[in-house]
Amino acid sequence: KTNKKPESWRKEIEHFNNWLNPEIGHLPIRKITAFNLEKIKKKMLDEGRAPRSIQYIFATFRQVWNYARLNDIVTHETPTRKVKLPKVNNKRLRYFTHVEVDILLEALKSKSQQVHDMTLFSLHTGARAGEVFSLTWGVVNLKNGTAQLRDGKGVDRHAYLTDATQSMLEQLHQEQDPSELVFTDSEGEKITKISNTFERTVKELGLNNGVTDSRDKAIFHTCRHTFASWHVQNGTDLYTVKELLGHSTIQLTERYSHLRPD
Protein backbone atom coordinates (compact mmCIF):
# COMPACT_ATOMS: atom_id res chain seq x y z
CA LYS A 1 0.00 0.00 0.00
CA THR A 2 1.24 3.50 -0.79
CA ASN A 3 0.25 7.02 0.13
CA LYS A 4 1.45 8.50 -3.14
CA LYS A 5 -0.79 11.00 -4.84
CA PRO A 6 -2.08 10.24 -8.36
CA GLU A 7 0.05 13.10 -9.69
CA SER A 8 3.19 11.47 -8.27
CA TRP A 9 2.30 8.19 -9.91
CA ARG A 10 1.66 9.94 -13.22
CA LYS A 11 5.04 11.66 -13.13
CA GLU A 12 6.92 8.48 -12.29
CA ILE A 13 5.24 6.55 -15.11
CA GLU A 14 5.97 9.41 -17.50
CA HIS A 15 9.62 9.52 -16.46
CA PHE A 16 9.92 5.75 -16.78
CA ASN A 17 8.46 5.76 -20.28
CA ASN A 18 10.52 8.74 -21.47
CA TRP A 19 13.93 7.86 -20.07
CA LEU A 20 14.21 4.40 -18.55
CA ASN A 21 12.13 2.26 -20.88
CA PRO A 22 13.91 3.20 -24.16
CA GLU A 23 17.30 2.22 -22.73
CA ILE A 24 16.60 -0.64 -20.35
CA GLY A 25 12.96 -1.64 -20.89
CA HIS A 26 13.96 -4.65 -23.01
CA LEU A 27 16.37 -6.00 -20.38
CA PRO A 28 15.57 -8.38 -17.52
CA ILE A 29 16.05 -6.30 -14.39
CA ARG A 30 18.89 -8.52 -13.15
CA LYS A 31 20.81 -7.71 -16.36
CA ILE A 32 20.71 -3.94 -15.87
CA THR A 33 24.14 -2.54 -15.00
CA ALA A 34 25.70 0.76 -14.03
CA PHE A 35 26.83 1.09 -17.66
CA ASN A 36 23.20 1.19 -18.82
CA LEU A 37 22.39 3.82 -16.23
CA GLU A 38 25.44 5.89 -17.21
CA LYS A 39 24.06 6.01 -20.76
CA ILE A 40 20.74 7.31 -19.44
CA LYS A 41 22.51 9.96 -17.39
CA LYS A 42 24.62 11.05 -20.39
CA LYS A 43 21.57 11.29 -22.63
CA MET A 44 19.75 13.45 -20.10
CA LEU A 45 22.76 15.73 -19.66
CA ASP A 46 23.18 16.02 -23.44
CA GLU A 47 19.56 17.10 -23.72
CA GLY A 48 20.02 19.75 -21.06
CA ARG A 49 18.05 18.10 -18.28
CA ALA A 50 18.56 19.60 -14.83
CA PRO A 51 20.40 17.65 -12.10
CA ARG A 52 17.16 17.50 -10.13
CA SER A 53 15.41 15.74 -13.04
CA ILE A 54 18.24 13.22 -13.37
CA GLN A 55 18.13 12.47 -9.67
CA TYR A 56 14.37 11.98 -9.87
CA ILE A 57 14.75 9.45 -12.71
CA PHE A 58 17.33 7.49 -10.75
CA ALA A 59 15.13 7.59 -7.65
CA THR A 60 12.32 6.08 -9.73
CA PHE A 61 14.65 3.30 -10.88
CA ARG A 62 15.75 2.63 -7.29
CA GLN A 63 12.14 2.15 -6.24
CA VAL A 64 11.65 -0.49 -8.94
CA TRP A 65 14.92 -2.21 -8.02
CA ASN A 66 14.14 -2.22 -4.30
CA TYR A 67 10.74 -3.74 -5.01
CA ALA A 68 12.39 -6.47 -7.09
CA ARG A 69 14.93 -7.13 -4.36
CA LEU A 70 12.21 -7.30 -1.72
CA ASN A 71 10.54 -10.01 -3.79
CA ASP A 72 13.79 -11.94 -4.41
CA ILE A 73 13.86 -11.12 -8.13
CA VAL A 74 17.33 -9.62 -7.67
CA THR A 75 19.70 -10.20 -4.77
CA HIS A 76 22.40 -7.54 -5.11
CA GLU A 77 22.37 -3.80 -4.46
CA THR A 78 21.06 -1.34 -7.00
CA PRO A 79 23.56 -0.37 -9.73
CA THR A 80 22.65 3.28 -9.14
CA ARG A 81 25.16 3.16 -6.28
CA LYS A 82 27.95 3.02 -8.87
CA VAL A 83 26.72 6.04 -10.84
CA LYS A 84 27.83 9.50 -9.76
CA LEU A 85 24.93 11.87 -10.20
CA PRO A 86 25.27 15.62 -10.82
CA LYS A 87 24.76 17.71 -7.73
CA VAL A 88 21.70 19.87 -7.37
CA ASN A 89 22.39 23.54 -6.74
CA ASN A 90 19.57 24.61 -4.45
CA LYS A 91 21.14 27.88 -3.42
CA ARG A 92 18.48 30.49 -3.87
CA LEU A 93 19.60 33.65 -5.60
CA ARG A 94 16.53 35.85 -5.37
CA TYR A 95 16.06 38.76 -3.01
CA PHE A 96 13.48 41.51 -3.03
CA THR A 97 14.17 45.09 -4.03
CA HIS A 98 13.00 47.88 -1.73
CA VAL A 99 10.19 48.69 -4.16
CA GLU A 100 9.07 45.04 -4.25
CA VAL A 101 9.03 44.89 -0.45
CA ASP A 102 6.91 48.02 -0.25
CA ILE A 103 4.27 46.76 -2.67
CA LEU A 104 4.33 43.24 -1.19
CA LEU A 105 3.77 44.44 2.37
CA GLU A 106 1.05 46.83 1.28
CA ALA A 107 -0.77 44.09 -0.61
CA LEU A 108 -0.42 41.57 2.22
CA LYS A 109 -1.75 44.06 4.75
CA SER A 110 -4.97 44.38 2.79
CA LYS A 111 -5.38 40.58 2.68
CA SER A 112 -4.03 39.23 5.98
CA GLN A 113 -2.58 41.27 8.82
CA GLN A 114 -0.90 38.18 10.25
CA VAL A 115 0.82 37.17 7.01
CA HIS A 116 1.93 40.79 6.66
CA ASP A 117 3.36 40.75 10.18
CA MET A 118 5.19 37.44 9.73
CA THR A 119 6.63 38.65 6.43
CA LEU A 120 7.75 41.91 8.01
CA PHE A 121 9.38 40.04 10.89
CA SER A 122 11.33 37.77 8.53
CA LEU A 123 12.38 40.66 6.30
CA HIS A 124 13.72 42.65 9.25
CA THR A 125 15.31 39.84 11.28
CA GLY A 126 16.28 37.18 8.74
CA ALA A 127 14.15 34.62 10.56
CA ARG A 128 13.35 31.35 8.83
CA ALA A 129 9.69 30.38 8.53
CA GLY A 130 10.08 27.78 11.29
CA GLU A 131 11.66 30.36 13.57
CA VAL A 132 8.75 32.72 12.98
CA PHE A 133 6.25 29.95 13.74
CA SER A 134 8.09 28.99 16.96
CA LEU A 135 8.47 32.54 18.30
CA THR A 136 7.03 32.92 21.81
CA TRP A 137 6.50 36.05 23.89
CA GLY A 138 8.98 34.77 26.44
CA VAL A 139 11.89 35.30 24.04
CA VAL A 140 10.74 38.71 22.82
CA ASN A 141 12.25 41.59 24.79
CA LEU A 142 10.42 44.73 23.75
CA LYS A 143 12.32 46.81 26.28
CA ASN A 144 15.70 45.95 24.79
CA GLY A 145 14.47 45.52 21.23
CA THR A 146 15.63 41.93 20.80
CA ALA A 147 14.17 38.50 20.15
CA GLN A 148 15.75 35.11 20.60
CA LEU A 149 15.37 32.83 17.60
CA ARG A 150 15.81 29.07 17.73
CA ASP A 151 16.54 27.17 14.54
CA GLY A 152 15.48 23.62 13.72
CA LYS A 153 18.61 22.21 15.37
CA GLY A 154 17.91 23.92 18.68
CA VAL A 155 20.59 26.60 18.25
CA ASP A 156 19.68 30.04 19.57
CA ARG A 157 20.68 33.44 18.26
CA HIS A 158 19.60 37.01 18.92
CA ALA A 159 17.66 39.12 16.44
CA TYR A 160 17.57 42.88 16.74
CA LEU A 161 14.19 44.50 16.27
CA THR A 162 13.87 47.40 13.88
CA ASP A 163 11.46 50.22 14.62
CA ALA A 164 8.92 48.59 12.31
CA THR A 165 9.10 45.15 13.94
CA GLN A 166 9.16 46.69 17.42
CA SER A 167 6.00 48.67 16.66
CA MET A 168 4.29 45.63 15.11
CA LEU A 169 5.05 43.42 18.12
CA GLU A 170 3.96 46.10 20.58
CA GLN A 171 0.57 46.22 18.86
CA LEU A 172 0.24 42.44 19.16
CA HIS A 173 1.49 42.24 22.73
CA GLN A 174 -0.99 42.11 25.60
CA GLU A 175 -0.52 40.13 28.80
CA GLN A 176 0.30 36.82 27.16
CA ASP A 177 1.98 34.00 29.02
CA PRO A 178 5.70 33.77 28.10
CA SER A 179 5.10 30.34 26.58
CA GLU A 180 2.39 31.63 24.24
CA LEU A 181 3.20 31.82 20.56
CA VAL A 182 3.34 35.23 18.92
CA PHE A 183 1.70 33.90 15.75
CA THR A 184 -0.94 31.15 15.80
CA ASP A 185 -3.45 29.62 13.43
CA SER A 186 -7.20 30.26 13.65
CA GLU A 187 -7.50 27.71 16.46
CA GLY A 188 -4.69 29.19 18.52
CA GLU A 189 -2.30 26.39 17.58
CA LYS A 190 1.21 26.53 16.16
CA ILE A 191 1.41 27.37 12.47
CA THR A 192 3.10 24.66 10.40
CA LYS A 193 3.34 26.35 7.01
CA ILE A 194 3.03 29.83 5.61
CA SER A 195 -0.44 30.75 4.42
CA ASN A 196 -1.24 30.43 0.72
CA THR A 197 -2.01 34.14 0.92
CA PHE A 198 1.71 34.84 0.54
CA GLU A 199 2.08 32.81 -2.65
CA ARG A 200 -1.16 34.16 -4.13
CA THR A 201 -0.12 37.74 -3.45
CA VAL A 202 3.31 37.22 -4.99
CA LYS A 203 1.60 35.81 -8.07
CA GLU A 204 -0.94 38.64 -8.28
CA LEU A 205 1.85 41.21 -8.08
CA GLY A 206 3.73 39.47 -10.88
CA LEU A 207 6.88 39.08 -8.79
CA ASN A 208 7.62 35.75 -10.48
CA ASN A 209 6.59 36.70 -14.00
CA GLY A 210 9.10 35.39 -16.52
CA VAL A 211 11.10 33.52 -13.86
CA THR A 212 12.00 30.00 -15.01
CA ASP A 213 14.78 29.04 -12.58
CA SER A 214 13.19 27.86 -9.33
CA ARG A 215 16.09 29.41 -7.39
CA ASP A 216 14.94 32.82 -8.60
CA LYS A 217 11.32 32.34 -7.55
CA ALA A 218 10.04 34.64 -4.83
CA ILE A 219 8.90 32.54 -1.86
CA PHE A 220 8.67 33.23 1.87
CA HIS A 221 12.33 32.22 2.34
CA THR A 222 13.20 35.08 -0.02
CA CYS A 223 12.52 37.39 2.94
CA ARG A 224 15.52 35.90 4.76
CA HIS A 225 17.73 36.31 1.70
CA THR A 226 16.53 39.88 1.37
CA PHE A 227 17.54 40.62 4.97
CA ALA A 228 21.04 39.27 4.32
CA SER A 229 21.42 40.89 0.90
CA TRP A 230 20.45 44.33 2.14
CA HIS A 231 22.86 44.06 5.06
CA VAL A 232 25.76 43.16 2.77
CA GLN A 233 24.84 45.90 0.30
CA ASN A 234 24.88 48.39 3.18
CA GLY A 235 28.41 47.35 4.14
CA THR A 236 27.79 44.94 7.01
CA ASP A 237 30.74 42.54 7.14
CA LEU A 238 30.11 38.89 6.31
CA TYR A 239 31.02 37.60 9.77
CA THR A 240 28.36 39.82 11.33
CA VAL A 241 25.82 38.68 8.73
CA LYS A 242 26.81 35.08 9.52
CA GLU A 243 25.92 35.62 13.18
CA LEU A 244 22.68 37.42 12.34
CA LEU A 245 21.58 34.56 10.08
CA GLY A 246 22.74 31.81 12.42
CA HIS A 247 24.91 30.18 9.75
CA SER A 248 27.14 27.38 11.02
CA THR A 249 30.01 28.31 8.69
CA ILE A 250 31.16 31.45 6.89
CA GLN A 251 31.01 29.51 3.61
CA LEU A 252 27.22 29.60 3.79
CA THR A 253 27.31 33.38 4.10
CA GLU A 254 29.79 33.90 1.29
CA ARG A 255 27.02 33.44 -1.27
CA TYR A 256 26.24 37.10 -0.58
CA SER A 257 29.83 38.34 -1.00
CA HIS A 258 29.24 39.58 -4.56
CA LEU A 259 26.79 42.15 -3.17
CA ARG A 260 29.44 43.96 -1.12
CA PRO A 261 29.90 47.61 -2.11
CA ASP A 262 33.22 48.42 -3.78
Task: Describe the predicted segments one by one.
Residues 1-73, 90-92, 111-113, 155, ...:
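N-terminal core-binding DNA-recognition domain of tyrosine site-specific recombinases/integrases
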Residues 47, 102, 106-116, 125, ...:
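Short, basic (Lys/Arg/His-rich) helix/loop patches that form interaction surfaces
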Residues 47, 51, 55-57, 70-129, ...:
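Basic, Lys/Arg- and aromatic-enriched nucleic-acid-binding interface segment
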Residues 37, 61, 97, 198, ...:
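Mobile genetic element proteins and their domesticated derivatives, centered on retroelements
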Residues 95, 148-154, 164, 245-262:
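Catalytic-site neighborhood detector that most strongly recognizes the C-terminal catalytic loop/helix
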Residues 15, 36-39, 100, 131, ...:
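Ca2+-coordinating acidic residues in Ca2+-binding motifs
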